Amino acid sequence: MKKTHRGVSFGTVFMLAVTIVVTGLSASILPRLLGTADLHMDTAALSALTLDGAIPALTLSDIPINNAMSEPSATPEPSDSATQAPTPVPTPTPFPGGTVTLTLGGSINIDDAVRKSAYYSESKKYDFTEILALLEDELSADLTMLSLENITSDAHQVSALNAPPVVFDMLAQSGVDIVALGYPKAVDKGLDGLRTTVAEAQERGLVTLGTYNSETDAATLRLFTIDGVKVAFLHFAESVTAAGKKAISGERAEYALATTHISGSEAAMLADIREARAVADVVVVSLNWGKVSAAKPTTAQQTLAQQIADAGADVIVGAGTRVVQPVTWLTSKDSSGNIRQTLCAWNLGSLLNESRKDGNVLGMLLQLQVFFDGKSISFEKACYTPTYIWRYKQDGQYQYRIVPSDQPAPDGMGDDQIGYMQKAYKNIQKYLGDSPVTLREK
């Protein structure tokens, strides 16, 4: 593009004028500064610097003066936004729910031989604490529950029914939190025997289920909060002996033993489960039921278990048969029509008893990891530890220890006992069959 010719700008003219003035002043001042120096400037040449009249005459009015020294503007007032406090960062909303681990075991039976093994003649005292010592890691969980099929009353002579109260020391020191006391013979020594048993357990910090010292105690839901997850435990006995019925009716203390089939108690049981469902995130229902040594549940048990699942149970565990029975899923719908899954372990067997029959020397610990997302639960882990009742002689007296049968034999176990333990392990795998639980990983 052709550029347009532009004239001499005003700025250029101004600068040339200043240069001429400075040059003239220098001509008059320098001789004085230099003394004898002879300085001569041709005025004709100086006039030539005017570019032959190209520079017009200038006056001050012709020179624009920028207002560079104008008064500063007033300091701006701070705006409202500058004085406002910073917006606080909102506190993160806590994540609803969490994870809880449960270990649920079968029954403890302090039979005569077991009781005698824990008696020390020198001190004339009982000490059961070593019996579960080899199982402490497996019993560890946020909440651990076992069943006891004995009463503990100092007012009565010790027997296969009445165990020394220090049996609760064994449970408490092994990490057990909850003990289910309801079973058919729980009131065979009257309500005093039942109340003493409950009191002995509670004095050692154990939470009791199934038998109660008062109506208030019976009406109090056993509710625990672990990692933000509310877990409810309930326990019921399938039946009660004639002696127990007489003791209960004599004092009109129907609250003392929670049952499933006595005088309309089934409806009361289901109502209790529904109430627990309304306030808990996880509901565990424990039952003492079934026929001794039966390999599978009866039709009546299956019907009752489905009713319990429909009422809101998430986990059902049984004890009382002294043998392990399968584990299965039960399907039901909640009040909103959503499909629910209930894990049902028909029977966990006996953790401790004196019998040496193949089915009675083994048991299992059901170990669960349950996650609650704020709305519903899921079973992150459903596994088991198989147990074996190791009996051996020491100083002419039998001793009992409960050991995990899938692990290496403990020190001191003879070859014959190792063989029995391995057999027990194979049997429990057979009993569980296609059950949805897996062997616990160490």
Model-derived regions: residue spans:
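Acidic, metal/ion-coordinating pockets
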Residues: 2, 10-20, 24-71, 76-442
